[in-house]
Amino acid sequence: MTLSSLFSRCVNRDYIRTSHSADYAYDLVGDQLTIYFQDSDGAVDWLRNLDFPAAAYKREGDTLWYAHRGFLKVWSTLIPRLEPMITGRQVKGITVVGYSHGAALAVFCHEYAWHSRPDLRSTLKGFGFGCPRVVWGRLTREQESCWQGFTVIRNREDIVTHLPPAALGYRHVGSLLEIGERGKYSPIDAHRAVNIRRELVLFEAKHPASTSGEHPKK
């Protein structure tokens, strides 16, 4: 599946609604699981986006790393819903996909799947379209490896992909794929779904081999 097709599917999905701004969807086709996370959808989501002091992300009482507090709160409500499908032994491949607010949740989900399914690490994939920065502070090489299959897709000046500011200690994880041209859109317009999809289609026309599993890194 091309990146533009994957993005369109993420944007146009019917999502399972939750009471914590953690809307998600999933496909289980044979033994392949794909989990989708919806973009910002209302005032509550935006309040979560702006709640960006760093907080400790813990598992079994141990601090793993530090993350955007608002996104971490949302992700914590999703774990009980997603854990059974991620750990299901019938699943032999996992892909996580998100846009905007949902891309931040995809960052968490990718790391969770990495730790929960070490047998699937070599094929685990994640895609964060218009992804904000989620992780705060320095990571060890071992920590960074959790996102070796994750790609942040940035439409150049997309304002969301530049927030929270790196000057505050926030950083992207995985690899960064930049699409589009500088100065073509305003920072806000560069984040709009219609413009991200347009630039993905143009990118794929220039790079015919580009799919959701194979694309040039920048």
Residue spans for each PLM region:
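Non-catalytic, mobile gating and regulatory segments of ester bond hydrolases
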Residues: 1-97, 101-218
